[in-house]
Regions:
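A short acidic, Gly/Pro-enriched loop at the edge of an enzyme's catalytic core
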Residues: 29-40
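A short glycine-rich, Lys/Arg-flanked "PGG" loop and its adjoining helix->strand segment in the class I
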Residues: 55-72
């Protein structure tokens, strides 16, 4: 992940796991690991945040290089339909200690969805305000499968949102699994 904060949260949540998961803060398109791995998981639309298609293609190549023969790459992305539908929408999420409002904009020329999030968090009797800017590229399943094949992946499967079945029309998120070929 590119976020030290997100990696810290992930490490805290996996402290009791054995073997301990390996976390690394680096750009996926320049992925360098100390040794090859059997499984790579890229979750929470991480590939969507790579807003240059050639960089996404390179990231997938780097994951391929980082895997042992027979290794598996699993990732999820928001569907283009979901990102397009966010255009002009305002979203609100609140509970007793957090208030979040954000507005989405989709640029059909660049295929990028941008959204700014205003986050208000209660701290005692006061509220603190922070702002986050997000940009996600709308990759189609077909494009990603093509990138995987170009990198050398085989046995590529595309699944619907949290189902071990092909995606249906209007799906919000898809999951993709691919295997690095075994050298004979």
């Amino acid at each position: 992940d590119m976020s030290e904060e997100m990696l810290t949260v992930a490490q805290q949540k996996t402290m009791d796991l054995m073997p301990r998961p390996f976390f690394s803060c680096q750009r996926l398109e320049r992925l360098a690991l100390p040794r090859a791995v059997d499984l790579a998981v890229c979750a929470l639309d991480s590939l969507d945040y790579i807003t240059e298609p050639k960089s996404c293609r390179e990231a997938i190549r780097q994951v391929y290089r980082a895997l042992n023969p027979g290794g598996i790459f699993i990732f999820d992305v928001n569907t283009p339909e979901k990102l397009r539908a966010m255009d002009g929408q305002v979203f609100l999420d609140e509970d007793d200690d957090v208030y979040c409002v954000w507005r989405g904009e989709f640029d059909r020329q660049t295929n990028i969805c941008s959204y700014g999030m205003d986050l208000f968090q209660r701290q005692g009797k006061l509220w603190s305000r922070s702002f986050e800017e997000h940009r996600e590229y709308a990759y189609s399943a077909e494009t990603l499968v093509d990138y995987l094949k170009q990198a050398g992946f085989t046995k590529i499967a595309v699944y619907g949102d949290c189902r071990m079945a092909p995606p249906e029309a209007g799906e919000q998120r898809i999951y993709i699994k691919a295997r690095k070929g075994i050298i004979k």
